[in-house]
Every structure is written in structure tokens, then in C-alpha cells.
């Protein structure tokens, strides 16, 4: 009897142990299933159920881009002056020591693409069905600073989008090879089929975008809008926010287009010639073709697919393109003028009521030095907290709160060699908002 009782206890002990193990395995399996079930259906920004919240927590833990030092990014994005001052002081100290990632670094790390994408924390799946169903095209024109390019690509990257990269023919071979190495890791990122040497303020800057336009239209990706970027741009909206903004355009384009000043009219009064730089000649130009009134803007656009098709295929557009090739900085009046051309899809009329400033358009947020000042006295924005280059602000941490209050999709200029804190905080802000749908 004693032996039988002992056996019963042992048997009961084994049963409880097995049951405990089974329950433990079930919990582990449940947790694992929650981790593995982070697909498009469970990533609904409007959902507050446990599964979606836990899924986002797991995602953010693995994909967050926190500032690498003790910087209060949440305070900086809110405009907290103590946090801003601390970041500016920190930047003065750190930028003396910080070495940017080199071409060699990217050539080495991209030998293993999966490691590169994981280590650099690229988002490799759509975060919502709305984004999946609304792919965006990018024309990215670059010529230097490989880290700037890689961080910009990471910030705007989504697997459903399509990216054409144009590298200046004059760029160093090491830079070109590093760009090729990075884009080789992504099936939806490619080098433009035709590369040109880009000369400042010349036609070649437009030609780079046109080359990407041709390639992007041949892509099988059914993109809806095209955004163009340069190496000093950075997004200030998440991909989901961009999709929402582009849908609200309802087929319209968004770009600066205003009446030119007398000073800017001189840009197309005489012909310019290009060697290694642009030269003004004494040869006067004929009036624009088709009696088209000229407008001025900047190099950046948010253009519908139909607009892009008409840029490349419409005979009137082609005549204007030929006419502006020997003008000064044609990128700053070609797009602005086409935006007012009645034959262009998504354009607006000539009438002054339709003039669009850079602050009204959503294409690019820029602080011009000659417009900075006291906002209470009527200035459009406060002074730059970074430095100026060609009268344009290279943003500092003190500009970030203002930047995020605007409706633009991207801003210009950023440079980690000038202020990396503002970029790190913007990266942290955008990644948090992309995954959680809320600000820091």
C-alpha cells in the first residue's frame, strides 16, 4: 500500500510537471505568435486592441532610432528652450569629434544586405494597407556625402514605393560605388539609366530629374505621385502622412509658382553657356514659346503621374523644355511655369489668385536668410539656429519645433556635419510616429 501511494504521488507529480510545461509552452507560443503576427492587417493605426498595441511595441523596440546621446528630443520637438539650448551646446562639442560614415563603411556593410538593412533599421514592410495601395515615386539627385544619402533613403523608404537615384557623373568613384552598393540591397531602388554631369544652376539639374522620370514611368510600380529630392533634404512627414496629403491633392500638383521679379526675369533674357560652370552671354533670347507667361519657383515639386507623362510627351511642354535649356537655373522656372500651363494635368490658372508661394506649396520647407526675423513684427519665420549656405538655413535643433508645425512633406537643408542633433531627433520623431501614429 505504501508503494502504491508513493507511485500515485509520483505519477501525480509528473502529471503536474507536464501540465506546467505545457502551460509554459503555450504562453511562449502565444507570445511568439503575437510577435510573428505583425502583418498589414494587425497594423491598424486606429486600432487600440492588445494585439495591435503589443505588435507595435515589438516593432518599435526593434526599429526605433533614438538619439545616440542624452538629448531630450521630445522636449526639442515641443520647442522646450532648455532642451534646445542643451542640444545646441552638445552639438558644439560633438561635431568636433564626430566622423561621418564613409564610402568604405557602406561598401563593407552592404556585402551582407540583410545585415545592413537590419543594422541600419530600414522598415521592410508596409505599415498600413492605405500605404500599400498608394505607392510614391522618388527622384533622388545626389553628388556627395554618402551618409546623408543613406539616412535620407532610410527616412523615406517603404517597400511599395519606387526610387530612382541619379548620381552626378563628376562624383568620386568611391561615392558612386557606395551608392550602387546601398541600392543593390533593395529591389525597388535603382540607379538612373542615364547619368549626366550636374553643373550648379545649369540645365543638367533638370535633366537628371527628367532621366529619372523616364525610368520611373517604365517601372511596373503603379505610383501615383513623384517627389524629387537632393542630398540635403529630409522628410518631415511619415509615409502615411504623405499618402494622406497626396490623396487630398486629388490629382493636383503642389509646387511654388509666382510672378517673377525683374531681377529673376534676367535669368531668361540672355542665353547662358555651360563648360565647367555657367557663363552669361550677350545673346538675347526669343520670347517663350506658345506665348506662355513665365513663372518662378524652386527646384522641388510634388507632381502627379499624369503631369510627369505630359512633361515628357506633350509637344508644348517639349518646346518649353528646349527653350529653357540655355537659361540660368531653369529648374526654378520650368516647373513653376508648367504648373500654370493650361494643357498640364493638375495645373492651376495664370490668374494672380492662384499664385503659390513656397510656404503655401507642400513640396519643400526652406528658411531664406533674407526673410528671417521677428515673427511678431511680421517676419515669416524666426532666425536660423544653424548656419547659412547660399542664403539658405542649414537647420539646427532650435528650428525643429517650427519645422514640425508646417504642412510640407520635406524640408531643406540638413547636414549632420553642421548639426546632427536636429537630424537624430527628426529621425526619432518620424520613426515613433510611423509605428505608433503619435508624436514623441
Curated annotation (Swiss-Prot):
Reaction(s) catalysed (UniProt annotation): a 3-O-[beta-D-galactosyl-(1->3)-N-acetyl-alpha-D-galactosaminyl]-L-seryl-[protein] + UDP-N-acetyl-alpha-D-glucosamine = 3-O-{beta-D-galactosyl-(1->3)-[N-acetyl-beta-D-glucosaminyl-(1->6)]-N-acetyl-alpha-D-galactosaminyl}-L-seryl-[protein] + UDP + H(+); a 3-O-[beta-D-galactosyl-(1->3)-N-acetyl-alpha-D-galactosaminyl]-L-threonyl-[protein] + UDP-N-acetyl-alpha-D-glucosamine = a 3-O-{beta-D-galactosyl-(1->3)-[N-acetyl-beta-D-glucosaminyl-(1->6)]-N-acetyl-alpha-D-galactosaminyl}-L-threonyl-[protein] + UDP + H(+); a beta-D-Gal-(1->4)-beta-D-GlcNAc-(1->3)-beta-D-Gal-(1->4)-beta-D-GlcNAc derivative + UDP-N-acetyl-alpha-D-glucosamine = a beta-D-Gal-(1->4)-beta-D-GlcNAc-(1->3)-[beta-D-GlcNAc-(1->6)]-beta-D-Gal-(1->4)-N-acetyl-beta-D-glucosaminyl derivative + UDP + H(+); 3-O-[N-acetyl-beta-D-glucosaminyl-(1->3)-N-acetyl-alpha-D-galactosaminyl]-L-seryl-[protein] + UDP-N-acetyl-alpha-D-glucosamine = 3-O-[N-acetyl-beta-D-glucosaminyl-(1->3)-[N-acetyl-beta-D-glucosaminyl-(1->6)]-N-acetyl-alpha-D-galactosaminyl]-L-seryl-[protein] + UDP + H(+)
Which residues bear sugar attachments? 108
Q: How is it modified after translation?
A: N-glycosylated.
Superkingdom of origin organism: Eukaryota
Stretches of the chain found on the membrane's Lumenal side? 31-440
- Detail the disulphide connectivity of this chain as listed in its UniProt entry: 73-230, 164-384, 185-212, 393-425
If you read the UniProt record, what top EC class would you report for this enzyme, in one word? Answer: transferase
Which BP terms from GO are recorded?
protein glycosylation
Q: How does it sit in the membrane?
A: Single-pass type II membrane protein
Cytoplasmic domain ranges by topology = 1-12
- A Pfam family that the UniProt record links to this protein: Branch
Record-level GO cellular component terms = Golgi membrane
List its EC numbers: 2.4.1.102, 2.4.1.148, 2.4.1.150
Give the transmembrane region(s). 13-30
Keywords per UniProt: Disulfide bond, Glycoprotein, Glycosyltransferase, Golgi apparatus, Membrane, Signal-anchor, Transferase, Transmembrane, Transmembrane helix
Task: Please state the pathway this protein functions in, per its UniProt record.
Answer: Protein modification; protein glycosylation
Molecular-function GO term, any one = acetylgalactosaminyl-O-glycosyl-glycoprotein beta-1,6-N-acetylglucosaminyltransferase activity
Enumerate the subcellular locations listed in this protein's record, separating them with semicolons. Answer: Golgi apparatus membrane
User: What does the protein in this record do?
Assistant: Glycosyltransferase that can synthesize all known mucin beta 6 N-acetylglucosaminides. Mediates core 2 and core 4 O-glycan branching, 2 important steps in mucin-type biosynthesis. Also has I-branching enzyme activity by converting linear into branched poly-N-acetyllactosaminoglycans, leading to introduce the blood group I antigen during embryonic development.
- Give the similarity note: Belongs to the glycosyltransferase 14 family.
Q: What is this protein called?
A: Beta-1,3-galactosyl-O-glycosyl-glycoprotein beta-1,6-N-acetylglucosaminyltransferase 3
Q: Which organism is it from?
A: Bubalus bubalis
Amino acid at each position: 500500500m505504501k508503494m502504491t501511494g508513493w507511485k500515485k504521488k509520483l505519477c501525480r507529480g509528473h502529471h503536474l510537471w507536464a501540465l506546467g510545461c505545457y502551460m509554459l509552452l503555450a504562453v511562449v507560443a502565444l507570445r511568439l505568435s503575437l510577435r510573428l503576427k505583425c502583418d498589414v492587417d494587425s497594423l491598424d493605426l486606429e486600432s487600440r486592441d492588445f494585439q495591435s498595441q503589443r505588435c507595435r511595441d515589438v516593432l518599435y523596440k526593434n526599429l526605433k532610432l533614438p538619439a545616440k546621446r542624452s538629448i531630450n528630443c521630445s522636449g526639442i520637438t515641443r520647442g522646450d528652450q532648455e532642451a534646445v539650448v542643451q542640444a545646441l551646446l552638445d552639438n558644439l562639442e560633438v561635431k568636433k569629434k564626430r566622423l561621418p560614415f564613409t564610402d568604405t563603411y557602406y561598401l563593407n556593410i552592404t556585402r551582407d544586405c540583410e545585415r545592413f538593412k537590419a543594422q541600419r533599421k530600414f522598415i521592410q514592410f508596409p505599415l498600413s494597407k492605405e500605404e500599400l495601395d498608394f505607392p510614391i515615386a522618388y527622384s533622388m539627385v545626389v553628388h556627395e556625402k554618402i551618409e546623408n544619402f543613406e539616412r535620407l533613403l532610410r527616412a523615406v523608404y517603404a517597400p511599395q514605393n519606387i526610387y530612382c537615384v541619379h548620381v552626378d557623373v563628376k562624383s568620386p568613384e568611391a561615392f558612386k560605388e557606395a551608392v550602387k552598393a546601398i541600392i543593390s540591397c533593395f529591389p525597388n531602388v535603382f540607379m538612373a539609366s542615364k547619368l549626366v554631369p550636374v553643373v550648379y544652376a545649369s540645365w543638367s539639374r533638370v535633366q537628371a530629374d527628367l532621366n529619372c522620370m523616364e525610368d520611373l514611368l517604365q517601372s511596373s510600380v503603379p505610383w501615383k505621385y513623384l517627389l524629387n529630392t537632393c542630398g540635403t533634404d529630409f522628410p518631415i512627414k511619415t509615409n502615411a502622412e504623405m499618402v494622406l496629403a497626396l490623396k487630398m491633392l486629388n490629382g493636383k500638383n503642389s509646387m511654388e509658382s509666382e510672378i517673377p521679379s525683374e531681377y529673376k526675369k534676367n535669368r531668361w533674357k540672355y542665353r547662358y553657356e555651360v563648360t565647367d560652370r555657367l557663363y552669361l552671354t550677350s545673346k538675347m533670347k526669343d520670347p517663350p514659346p506658345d506665348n506662355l507667361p513665365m513663372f518662378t519657383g524652386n527646384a522641388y515639386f510634388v507632381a502627379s503621374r499624369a503631369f510627369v507623362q505630359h512633361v515628357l510627351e506633350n509637344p508644348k511642354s517639349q518646346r518649353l523644355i528646349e527653350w529653357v535649356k540655355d537659361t540660368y537655373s531653369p529648374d526654378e522656372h520650368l516647373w513653376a511655369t508648367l504648373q500654370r500651363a493650361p494643357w498640364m494635368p493638375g495645373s492651376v490658372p495664370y490668374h494672380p489668385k492662384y499664385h503659390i508661394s513656397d510656404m503655401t506649396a507642400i513640396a519643400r520647407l526652406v528658411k531664406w536668410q533674407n526673410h528671417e526675423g521677428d515673427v511678431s513684427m511680421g517676419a515669416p519665420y524666426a532666425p536660423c539656429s544653424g548656419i547659412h549656405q547660399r542664403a539658405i538655413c542649414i537647420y539646427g535643433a532650435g528650428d525643429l519645433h517650427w519645422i514640425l508645425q508646417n504642412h510640407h512633406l520635406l524640408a531643406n537643408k540638413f547636414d549632420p556635419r553642421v548639426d546632427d542633433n536636429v537630424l537624430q531627433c527628426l529621425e526619432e520623431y518620424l520613426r515613433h510616429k510611423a509605428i505608433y501614429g503619435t508624436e514623441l
